[in-house]
Regions:
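Transmembrane core module of solute transporters
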Residues: 7-70, 99-102, 107, 140-142, ...
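Helix-loop-helix hairpins in multi-pass membrane proteins, especially solute transporters
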Residues: 55, 62-200, 226
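Residue-level hotspots within transmembrane alpha-helices of multi-pass secondary transporters
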Residues: 31, 63-64, 118, 148, ...
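Small-residue-rich alpha-helical segments with characteristic i,i+4
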Residues: 136-138, 143-149, 155, 357-441
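Symmetry-related core transmembrane helices of the 12-TM Major Facilitator Superfamily/SLC fold
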Residues: 167-182, 231-235, 483-498
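Helix-loop junctions on the cytosolic side of multi-pass membrane transporters
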Residues: 179-198, 244-253, 420, 499-509
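Membrane-embedded alpha-helical segments of multi-pass transporters/permeases
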Residues: 90-94, 178-183, 240-244, 343-346, ...
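Hydrophobic transmembrane architecture of multi-pass small-molecule transporters
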Residues: 401-502, 507-529
Length: 529
C-alpha cells in the first residue's frame, strides 16, 4: 500500500509538471505580442491568431478527450500529448517567420488540449472520493498558479532576454516529463476498441470551433458584426445538433447524461460564473496598469505575483480542507471574499496606490483558491467511475466556453461603458457655458505664460491635455463598471453555493441504510417473535 501511494504521488508530480507547462504556455505570449509583431512584421490582427488558433484547437479537442482516453488509454495519450506539446514549443522557439510560429502554436495546442482533461481523469482514478479533494487541490495548483505567474515570467524574460527564451526554457522540462512519464505512467484502465462517432465528431468540431471563434471576436468587433453573428449562430446550431445526436447514441463520445446528477450540474454552473470573474481580473488589471497608469509589463506581472503565490500555497490546503469539511463552507467563504474584493476594484482611479491593488488582488486570489477545484470536485464526486472521463471533458469544455464568453462579455461592457463615460464628459464641456469658457481661457493664458509659448500653442496644448484626461478617466470608469458586473456574477455564484452539498455523505447514508436493512430480521421471523 505504501509503495502504491508513493507511486501515485510520483505520477501526480509528473502529471502536474506536464499540465503546468501547458497552462503556463497559454499566458506567456500575451506580453510578447508587440515584440512578435515587430519581429515578424505583421499586424495586431494577424498576431492575435497565435492566441485564437491555440484556443480553437483546445476547444475542439477537449470534447473529444473522453473518447481518446477510452480508446488509447492514459499512458499513450499522455506521452503523445507531451511529445506534441514539446515539439510545438521547439518549433515556436526556432521559428524564422510567422507561419512557422503559428504552426508550432497549433501543434502545442493539440498536446495542451488533451492534457487538461486527461490529467483530471487520472486524478479521479488515483484518489477515492473521501480523499479526492487533496488530489484536486494539487490539480488546481497548476490550473490557477500557472496563468497567474505567466505574465510575471514573460515580462521578466522580455525585458532581459529574447522572447525565444520563453520557449527554449520549456523544451528540456518537457523532455524530462516525457522520460519520467514513460517509466512511471501506468494505465488506470485498459484501452477499449471503440469506434469514433464520425457524425458526432464533425458536429462537435464545427459547433465548438464556430462558437469559440465568434465569441472571441465579439469583444473587438462587436456582437452585431456579421461574421460574429453568423459564426455564433452556426456554433449554437452545431452544438445543439451535437447534443441531440449524443443523447440518442448508445456509445456517446461526450455523454451529456452527466447533467442528470444535480450536484454536477450545479457545480458546473457555479464554476462557469467563477471563471468569468477570474478572467475579468486577468483581462482588466493589465489594461489598467499598462495602458492607463503606464506600468511596464514586468511591473504589471509583479503586481499579480503575490496573488499567484497565495494560490500556490492555498490550492493544496483547500483540497485538504475539502476532504474534511466538504464544499459548501469553502465555497461560501471563498465567494464572500471574491465578491468583496471584486467590488473593491470598482473604485479604481488613476491615483490608486500600487500596494493597495497588490493587497486586494492577493486577497481575491486567496478567496478564489477555495473555489474552482473544491466546487468542481463536489460535482465530480457524484459521478460513477465510468462517467469520470465524460465529466472531466464536460467540465473543461464548459470552462473553455465560459472563459471565452466571459472575456468577450467583459470586453464589451468595458468598451461600451468607456464610450458612454467619454460622451458624458464631452457633454459637460459646454462651450456655451460662460463659467466653463472663463475657466478654459484662464487656463490657456496661465499655460502660455508658464511655458513661454503663444496663446494659440497653449490652446492646442490645453485642449489636447483635457481630451487625453477625459479618455483616461473614461477608460478607468469603464473598467470599474466591468468589475461591477463581475461582482454581480459572483453574488449569483454565492447564492447558488448555498445549495451545494457533500455527496460523499449521500453515499455514506445509502451505505448505512443498506447495512441496516441487512441486519433486520426477515418479515416472517419478525412476526414470529
Amino acid at each position: 500500500m505504501a509503495s502504491q501511494k508513493k507511486g501515485n504521488m510520483s505520477l501526480l508530480i509528473i502529471l502536474m509538471a506536464g499540465l503546468f507547462l501547458a497552462i503556463l504556455n497559454q499566458t506567456l505570449l500575451n506580453v510578447a505580442m508587440p515584440h512578435l509583431m515587430t519581429e515578424f512584421n505583421v499586424s495586431a490582427t494577424t498576431i492575435q491568431w497565435l492566441t485564437t488558433g491555440y484556443m480553437l484547437v483546445n476547444g475542439v479537442l477537449i470534447p473529444l478527450s473522453a473518447f481518446l482516453i477510452m480508446r488509447f488509454g492514459g499512458r499513450s495519450l499522455f506521452l503523445t500529448a507531451m511529445l506534441l506539446f514539446t515539439a510545438g514549443t521547439l518549433i515556436c522557439g526556432i521559428s524564422p517567420n510567422f507561419s512557422t510560429m503559428l504552426t508550432g502554436r497549433l501543434i502545442q495546442a493539440v498536446g495542451g488540449g488533451i492534457l487538461q482533461p486527461l490529467v483530471m481523469t487520472t486524478i479521479l482514478f488515483i484518489f477515492p472520493p473521501e480523499s479526492r479533494g487533496k488530489g484536486m487541490g494539487i490539480f488546481g495548483l497548476a490550473m490557477m498558479f500557472a496563468p497567474a505567474v505567466g505574465p510575471t515570467l514573460s515580462g521578466w524574460v522580455i525585458e532581459n532576454y529574447s522572447w525565444r527564451i520563453m520557449f527554449y526554457g520549456l523544451v528540456p522540462v518537457g523532455v524530462i516529463v516525457i522520460i519520467l512519464g514513460f517509466f512511471l505512467f501506468k494505465n488506470m484502465t485498459e484501452p477499449k476498441k471503440i469506434k469514433l462517432d464520425t457524425a458526432g465528431a464533425i458536429l462537435s468540431v464545427v459547433g465548438f470551433a464556430a462558437l469559440l471563434y465568434g465569441v472571441s471576436e465579439a469583444g473587438s468587433d462587436g456582437w452585431d458584426d456579421p461574421i460574429v453573428l453568423s459564426t455564433v449562430v452556426i456554433g449554437v446550431i452545431g452544438i445543439a445538433a451535437f447534443i441531440i445526436q449524443q443523447l440518442k447514441s448508445k456509445e456517446p463520445m461526450l455523454d451529456f447524461r452527466v447533467f442528470k446528477y444535480d450536484m454536477f450540474s450545479l457545480s458546473s454552473v457555479i464554476n462557469a460564473i467563477i471563471t468569468v470573474a477570474l478572467y475579468a481580473g486577468m483581462f482588466l488589471i493589465p489594461i489598467y496598469l499598462q495602458n492607463l497608469v503606464g506600468f511596464t509589463a514586468l511591473q504589471s506581472g509583479l503586481l499579480m505575483l503575490p496573488g499567484a503565490l497565495v494560490m500556490l500555497v492555498m490550492s493544496p490546503i483547500s483540497g485538504i480542507l475539502f476532504d474534511k469539511v466538504g464544499p459548501r463552507p469553502l465555497a461560501i467563504v471563498g465567494l464572500l471574499i471574491t465578491v468583496v474584493t471584486t467590488y473593491e476594484f470598482t473604485t479604481l482611479t488613476i491615483n490608486t496606490p500600487y500596494m493597495y491593488i497588490v493587497l486586494i488582488y492577493a486577497i481575491r486570489a486567496f478567496g478564489m483558491s477555495m473555489l474552482m477545484m473544491p466546487i468542481m470536485t463536489a460535482g465530480m464526486n457524484q459521478l460513477p467511475q465510468h462517467l469520470n472521463s465524460h465529466g472531466t471533458a464536460m467540465s473543461n469544455t464548459l470552462r473553455q466556453i465560459s472563459g471565452s464568453i466571459g472575456t468577450s462579455l467583459i470586453t464589451t461592457i468595458y468598451t461600451n461603458r468607456t464610450t458612454f463615460h467619454y460622451a458624458s464628459m464631452a457633454d459637460q464641456t459646454n462651450t456655451a457655458d460662460p463659467s466653463f469658457m472663463s475657466t478654459l481661457q484662464s487656463t490657456i493664458q496661465s499655460t502660455a505664460q508658464s511655458m513661454h509659448i503663444s496663446l494659440e500653442q497653449a490652446q492646442q496644448y490645453v485642449v489636447k491635455y483635457l481630451t487625453g484626461q477625459a479618455q483616461l478617466n473614461s477608460n478607468v470608469m469603464g473598467i470599474n463598471d466591468a468589475f461591477m458586473w463581475a461582482a454581480g456574477f459572483c453574488v449569483i455564484g454565492l447564492v447558488l453555493s448555498l445549495f451545494l452539498r457533500d455527496v460523499r455523505k449521500d453515499k455514506l447514508h445509502r451505505k448505512n441504510k443498506a447495512e441496516e436493512l441487512t441486519l433486520l430480521p426477515a418479515p416472517k421471523e419478525a412476526k414470529e417473535s
